[in-house]
From Swiss-Prot:
Zn finger limits (CHY-type): 1013-1082
Source organism (scientific name): Arabidopsis thaliana
Subcellular location, principal: membrane
Quaternary structure annotation from Swiss-Prot or TrEMBL: Binds zinc and iron ions.
Zinc finger (CTCHY-type) stretch: 1084-1147
Positions bound to Zn(2+) 3: C1062, C1065, C1075, C1080
Topology relative to the membrane: Single-pass membrane protein
Binding site for Zn(2+) 4: C1089, C1092, H1103, C1110
Record region (Disordered): 1-30
Protein name: Zinc finger protein BRUTUS-like At1g18910
Superkingdom: Eukaryota
One example of a Gene Ontology biological process annotation: iron ion import across plasma membrane
Function: Probable E3 ubiquitin-protein ligase that may regulate the response to iron deficiency and thus contributes to iron homeostasis.
ZnF (RING-type) ranges: 1148-1190
Length: 1254
């Protein structure tokens, strides 16, 4: 199969189309439009968005290239790997710049935004790892080429979806905030800091790469932006412009291997005379060929490399020793400022050593290996300082942020170890490596090595190094270097050489004192603190007894006002390069507690269960279904018959995920952000939800396309089918990656916040609000789906949390009723299920015992046929509840209170006469049809039911001795034999309506009733329906339960109702959504509830699983929600209300009707009590206080002012004029004094007259 490109699909017409992110961009908020409408000339920070455009274009190009089926696998793999290595490197620097420069700055102005985006950056490495694996397989030509290419295309699609969605989110949230909160100058400063923090070698490649993928207009805008961003220094402007217009790829090979930590050359064994071997591919030969092309005119001054390296090593050693001495002199708290400077110097030298070590491994050491055999290079190869320096840098960072009481002592010990390590490494290099390189390389080649090494440093750090190094050198050495840099042929890039000369001269001039130099560098190398607030307590006690956190007077390292100085014209982010070069993160943007240690999430939750954990159990189930999507989409490529099952499962996943996302966006996240310090923390996740729904919609579209294709084309190998399957698998893998990472980030960032910031009661309220929006029909799908993904302990934990959150409702009752009926159905299905073949269990038993048995054995079993009266008695004796139909299709699922009142039957005598004949004929037809179809069955049922216990035992022994049966067949027949009598009884019991219907007078009320006799509409005044219910207490048919309750002196228990009568065919039958008479099959009503035994063909009704009643309305989450505390279904318009526990489970204070099951509208009072709306209207004609708690029913200020005016006109008798009375206010609950009055007493606290004498 040719791989090719996935089939185009809407709404995103082509995934490879340049600069077109998913269609979700059309739903961008006003913040996103701020980015789209802003110009780069007005907002320099948008340079990062132009990088986004380049990334999108490059990914589209790579996906197109991967679809090339003509080229050989190895050639294609090499080209793709080279481009992906470069893309990975550029994206790493882009992400590091956002983390350490953009995000850190934004976090000083807008809190709780950036951590989620940094987590997304961390997840990118896995994406590239996968594609590199398949490229290796493709290059080695292992396996089927088409299958490997398919995997490569799928990996690229996943990378494209993940990175493009991440960039789109940044454009919708991060960069609009940057434009809003930062001035033009501040944005330009951040962009320039990013440029100065990237190695020169990388900058030389990034800028041409980016501009080559932009349109001419965009390229011009970028060039104009750089003129504004780069400081107004001619040398810098010339250098940046030279990089922008340079489109050479000379250093691409070395560049892409900088970060890989591998040697970029192939070792050649015989390199003694390698200068003349132009066919060799070693680094030495490439540098040699390069040096021959150069025409350096400077004189050959000898071993320039060895001499320069000695100067470099001595400067580093000298500074390390000076710092060590400075640490030893710290004995008093007054010298704590000196400690700040020493830590900055250590950070600077650590960065210098890290870059130097990487440059040595990348350039110098491979050349050295090309010149000697492995035996001579073993000592230098086994010992390198990079690991020691990285560990020291990590330790320094951690100790500075957290530290211990012995911070300085610990630092001294680690520094001493570092000095010994560095000295040993430098000694090996000076005695083994550099002398050989200097001896075998001419001056031009040595300069090329130095040139490449200098380019390894970031621009900002390079300036710091030159300034620092020039201050360490004697005057004659400085003059020699100045002379070298001043020569015309010192470097290929003349502007860059001139810039280095300018920096060196400034450092050599001494215009910046050493103290000022380190103070200026403190802005770049100041250690980052993990705490947000500056500690202002004064140090007390001895120096070594202080907390290390109090030793550093740390200013904001991301202030937009860096200290003025020559050094800060080229700012440098040390943390940005640490993120690239040092494995592991040094900076936690947010400190998360170690919730689990080495335990899994499930193990932890069962130990420390909290209500909010219910959300994350849902996450676990969702993750398993994401795996199912990937497996299922792959299976569809070879099995189109699987489409129906996959489509059904996907729609369930999509539906449940949408419910979960909406609940988080509308309930959980707002509750979290309501905590003052957590504002904005969830906005990124809400954007994720919106974008992920778009991806799910694409899957729905593809599945519909596949379904239509299957109906028209039976050949599943059709090319269009293959392309659709390819597109489906591509999107499913992308969804798996996006949603898995999304759920992981929620658990990483938000879970501990929910658990720690909310009390148990608050968590229960959040969960209760989320559950109160889920209808019973959804719960019947959700609960089994959730349970099948969890282990037994987790299942128990989930149901425990669920029951706890709904303990004040009828949920337990609903769950029991639903689960019992569900279990009965499953048992019945299991009893009728043949594990080996699709045959009836009674047929299996019958064929073995009777058809294959001898005549005398048949007679022995069937010698006791049941008499008709005995059979009727058995059939009329229920052995258990008939299994309800659990797969009834519900109508509308949502509404408010309902248990509707009833009416008497409306049926004329003529109607009875007319329908008596119809009833008899229908009953006769029904009975005849059953007699015909069941005559053979009845004889079998009689024989099976006539078997005694002794007969059953004898039969079991006979089966066990039958040598013609295998053990599995024996077990199966014995099992069916033991169940046969129960199954036969159940089936006979379900035939009971035909017997009952044969004698119509035996059941009173077996005639139709009408809601509208003139239009012949079935029902009663309460309901429009096509059936009657058989009341077991009266053995009489009533149209509805309320009709029964109004006619007799007792109440009908709905749970006891098992039979109904169809008013069209007049057949009594088990309760169901439609008539079981095949000749009728009429619907009993648009809405049917098997729990309430409620039918209605007129209104929108839903069954609330928490009230366990049917209510009028469209349903939970549509126009109603269930408040778990009030235990009431309420309109979504009154989400904010006064909760009163089980407020509806009481009588109306006016008419004393039980409100919970009343069908009359209910009025909620401000105090939380309720009464009927009609009762409220009548009551408020003469009262203004609650009849239960006496609080005012509304705002009574107008009435109270009228009383003020009335009392002001009244004159009290003299004997009462100065008397007061003690009162208690019903509104505010306070006690106070009021002037004497026979009726009205005003509260002195709230000015209410709703008071009483105390």
């Amino acid at each position: 199969m040719g791989v090719g490109d996935p089939l185009p699909l809407p709404p995103e017409k082509n995934r490879r189309e340049v600069n077109k992110p998913p269609d979700i961009a059309s739903t961008s908020s006003s913040s996103a439009s701020a980015v789209n409408n802003a110009r780069l000339s007005d907002a320099p920070i948008l340079l990062f968005v132009y990088f986004h455009k380049a990334f999108r274009a490059q990914l589209a190009e790579l996906q197109f290239l991967a679809g090339d089926t003509v080229r050989s696998g190895s050639d294609l793999a090499v080209e793709l790997r080279s481009k992906f290595e470069f893309l990975k490197l550029v994206y790493k620097y882009h992400s590091a710049a956002e983390d350490e420069v953009i995000f850190s700055a934004l976090d000083t102005r807008v809190k709780n935004i950036v951590f989620n985006y940094s987590l997304e950056h961390d997840a990118t490495d896995d994406l590239f790892t996968s594609v590199f694996h398949w490229l290796n397989v493709l290059e080695e030509e292992q396996g089927n080429r088409a299958d490997v290419l398919r995997e490569v295309v799928l990996c690229i699609g996943t990378i494209q979806s993940s990175i493009c969605q991440h960039m789109l989110k940044e454009e919708r949230q991060v960069f609009p905030l940057m434009i809003e909160n930062f001035s033009f100058e501040e944005q330009a400063s951040l962009v320039w800091q990013f440029i100065c923090s990237v190695p020169v070698m990388v900058l030389e490649e990034i800028f041409p790469w980016m501009t080559s993928l932009l349109s001419p207009k965009e390229k011009s805008e970028v060039e104009t932006c750089f003129k504004e961003v780069v400081p107004n220094e001619l040398s810098l402007q010339l250098v940046i412009n030279s990089w922008l217009i340079d489109d050479s790829q000379s250093s691409l090979t070395a560049l892409t291997k900088i970060m890989k930590g591998v040697q970029s050359v192939e070792v050649s064994e015989n390199m003694t005379n390698s200068q003349t071997n132009s066919s060799s591919s070693g680094v030495f030969q490439r540098f040699w060929q390069w040096s021959k092309k150069m025409s350096f005119s400077s004189p050959n001054t000898g071993h320039i490399l060895v001499h320069g390296i000695h100067l470099w090593h001595n400067a580093i050693r000298k500074d390390l020793v000076d710092i060590q001495k400075g640490l030893c002199q710290l004995t008093f708290p007054s010298l704590s400022l000196d400690l700040n400077v020493l830590v900055v110097r250590l950070n600077f030298l650590a960065d210098v050593l890290i870059f130097y070590s990487n440059a040595f491994k990348t350039f110098f050491y491979p050349v050295f290996e090309d010149m000697v055999d492995q035996q001579h290079s073993s000592s230098s190869k086994q010992f390198t300082i990079d690991g020691h320096v990285e560990n020291f840098k990590k330790s320094l960072d951690l100790e500075t942020r957290a530290g211990s009481d012995n911070f300085v002592i610990t630092l001294q010990e680690k520094l001493e170890s570092l000095i010994l390590t560095v000295a040993k490494q430098f000694s090996i290099e000076e005695t083994e490596v550099f002398p050989i390189i200097s001896k075998n390389c001419n001056i031009e080649m040595q300069r090329q090595l130095l040139y490449r090494s200098i380019h390894f440093l970031p621009l900002g750090l390079l300036k710091c190094v030159i300034m620092w190094f020039s201050a360490q050198l004697p005057e004659d050495e400085c003059q020699s270097i100045i002379h070298y840099l001043s020569s015309e042929d010192s470097f290929p890039n003349k502007p860059f050489a001139h810039l280095l000369l300018q920096w060196f001269r400034f450092g050599y001039s001494g215009k910046t004192p050493v103290e000022s130099f380190w103070n200026e560098l403190s802005f770049m190398f100041k250690p980052r603190c993990s705490f947000e607030e500056e500690l202002t307590e004064e140090a007390s006690g001895s120096f070594f007894q202080q907390s290390p956190q109090k030793l550093f007077k740390v200013s904001d390292p991301y202030s937009m006002d860096p200290p003025a100085g020559y050094m800060n014209e080229t700012p440098y982010s040390s943390a940005m390069n640490q993120q690239i070069l040092i494995p592991g993160k040094l900076r936690p943007l947010l400190h998360l507690p170690d919730l689990f240690g080495d335990k899994t999430i499930g193990e932890h939750l069962t130990m420390d269960l909290k209500p909010i954990d219910l959300i994350f159990y849902f996450h676990k189930a969702m993750k398993k279904d994401l795996d199912y999507l990937v497996r299922g989409s792959a299976r569809l490529a070879t099995d189109y018959s699987f489409l129906g099952e996959f489509q059904q499962r996907f729609h369930l996943i999509k539906f449940l995920y949408q419910i979960h996302s909406d609940a988080e966006d509308e309930i959980a996240f707002p509750a979290l952000e309501a905590k003052g310090k957590l504002q904005n923390i969830s906005q990124s996740y809400s954007i994720d939800h919106e974008l992920e729904v778009e991806h799910l919609n694409k899957v729905s579209f593809l599945l519909n396309e596949l379904a239509e294709l299957n109906m028209l084309v039976l050949d599943h190998k059709n090319v269009k089918y293959e392309k659709l399957c390819m597109s489906l698998q591509d999107i499913c893998k992308s969804i798996h990656k996006l949603l898995s990472e999304h759920l992981h980030r929620e658990e990483t960032e938000l879970w501990c916040l929910f658990r720690d910031c909310f009390t148990i009661e608050e968590q229960e309220k959040i969960i209760a609000c989320m559950l109160g929006r889920i209808s019973g029909e959804i719960l019947q799908d959700m609960i089994p789906w959730l349970m099948e993904s969890l282990i037994p302990d987790e299942q128990h934990a989930v149901m425990s949390l669920w029951r706890q959150a709904t303990r004040k409702t009828m949920f337990g009752e609903w769950l029991t009723e639903w689960y019992n009926s569900h279990a009965v159905e499953e048992e019945t299905e299991e009893a009728n299920k043949d594990p080996s073949e699709n045959s009836d269990p009674l047929d299996v038993v019958w064929s073995y015992l009777f058809e294959g048995a001898a005549d005398e054995y048949k007679g022995s079993i069937c010698s006791k046929p049941l008499e008709e009266t005995e059979l009727k008695g058995i059939m009329n004796k229920p052995l258990g509840k008939a299994a309800p139909n659990n797969k009834v299709e519900f109508g509308n699922k949502e509404e408010n209170h309902l248990e509707i009142s009833g009416s008497k039957k409306v049926c004329t005598g003529a109607d009875e006469t007319k329908y008596k004949e119809q009833t008899d004929s229908n009953a006769q037809a029904f009975q005849m049809s059953h007699n015909t179809s069941q005559s053979g069955q009845d004889s079998r049922y009689e024989c099976l039911l006539s078997m005694s216990q002794e007969d059953v035992e004898a039969t079991i022994r006979r089966i066990s001795r039958d040598s013609s049966l295998d053990p599995q067949k024996k077990s199966y027949i014995i099992q069916n034999l033991l169940m046969s009598r129960w199954i036969a009884t159940q089936r006979i019991y379900n035939l009971e309506p035909s017997i009952l219907s044969s004698n119509r007078e035996a059941v009173p009320g077996q005639n139709p009733s009408y809601r509208d006799p003139h239009k012949l509409i079935f029902g009663c005044k309460h309901y429009k329906r096509s059936c009657k219910l058989l009341a077991p207490c009266c053995n009489k048919l009533y149209t509805c339960i309320r009709c029964h309750d109004e006619e007799v002196d007792h109440l009908l228990d709905r749970k006891q109702i098992t039979k109904m009568m169809c008013m069209k065919c007049m057949i009594i039958q088990p309760v169901g959504a439609s008539c079981s008479n095949i000749s009728c099959s009429s619907s009993m009503g648009k809405y049917y509830c098997k729990i309430c035994k409620l039918f209605d063909d007129d209104r929108e009704i839903y069954h609330c699983p928490y009230c366990n009643l049917c209510r009028l309305g469209k349903g939970l989450s549509i126009d109603y929600f269930h408040c778990m505390k009030c235990n009431a279904c309420m309109s979504r318009l009154i989400v904010e209300h006064v909760c009163r526990e089980k407020c509806l489970e009481d009588n109306c204070p006016i008419c004393h009707e039980y409100i919970f099951t009343s069908n009359s509208p209910v009025k909620a009072l401000p105090c939380g009590h309720v009464m009927h709306s009609t009762c409220f209207q009548e009551y408020t004609c003469s009262h203004y206080t609650c009849p239960i708690c006496s609080k005012s029913l509304g705002d009574m200020q107008v009435y109270f002012r009228m009383l003020d005016a009335l009392l002001a006109e009244q004159k009290m008798p003299d004997e009462y004029l100065n008397q007061t009375q003690v009162i208690l206010c019903n509104d505010c609950g306070r006690k106070g004094n009021a002037p004497y009055h026979w009726l009205y007493h005003k509260c002195s606290s709230c000015a209410s007259y709703n008071t009483r004498l105390f």
